[in-house]
């Protein structure tokens, strides 16, 4: 089952000189990795439309119904110990546009709702902070997933949330190359004060500085910050370049950029100015089966990078767009565009990872533990869900 897509519309109102030259690492596949299952837990009697694991914290498993604001807490035996929601006009409210849950050092739940703002809640749902959104959004398009689109980090004893929004600047409808040249793509919010700073312009040589314009989904940064090394690893969704930043100071400084040899990844060169509007997310008719960077997770000293390739059969894609394709062709193209995951080692080697069947085609990494959910029987209404966890193993 493909993850359901949300499409909502809301009518609301450094570059760096010391970066290294882009280098392309040749793929080196001495072996293949896979997820080795170590244990699992089953939670039962759950009535939820989009039930997704959020994290394991202080001996409890957290889940959400992503189609609402309902949160579930289970103990290590799989027994429900608490559930609550933040629907309606209540303090700390959030909706289906909220991110996955992160946990601060006090054990509070931190969520980013791109329409409502950052919410910090106690485990019993009491409100700690209820911050407004940094900038009102005009549209949203995303898939439900165990992958995180934000990260809670600590720097010099303070906690911050790093994330991105499609609309960061004041919305004035003007969309041109100058807009992209000025744009900073990462937001860093102090979780005590809600003070927010903008970081990470498109680096010199980036695809997005080529004089064209892009759908906003193409611009979205995918990132992972490592507190030990104080390195920020970042890629943009439609660009196969891994940017590495030294973030030991106040501002991230670009120190390396490498084009990764991701099999099947096709670079899109953009649209002429005026062809698309400001804030548009995407359009299958004009951007079918796009190659996307989906997720970056730190695993030990290495990176797990997930992406979706573009099918090679252009004539078949044209038939799909024209509505003249058979069901068999559509199924084949969907299969060719399925997500792939590779392990990018510290030495630059790219090693393929075999993925198990996973609910919502995604996983969550916490330290050296990988979590994923069992895919339910599509012909049965699921009321129990299995969560697996394990580690990466070489075949």
PLM segments and residue spans:
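Beta-strand-rich domains and repeat architectures in extracellular enzymes and scaffolds
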Residues: 39-70, 293-308, 313-315
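Structural signature of eukaryotic scaffold interfaces centered on beta-propeller domains
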Residues: 50-56, 99-104, 148-158, 217-228, ...
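Asp-box/WD-like beta-propeller blade repeats and closely related beta-sheet repeat scaffolds
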Residues: 116-117, 123-177
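A short helix->beta-strand "capping" segment at the edge of beta-propeller domains
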Residues: 23-49, 346-353
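Surface-exposed loop and turn segments in beta-propeller and other repeat-based domains
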Residues: 36-43, 84-94, 131-146, 196-216, ...
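Blade-loop segments of beta-propeller domains
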Residues: 80-108, 113-115, 131-140, 357-359
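Beta-propeller blade signature
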Residues: 177-194, 322-347, 385-394
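Loop/turn-rich, solvent-exposed surfaces of beta-rich toroidal or solenoidal domains
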Residues: 287-344
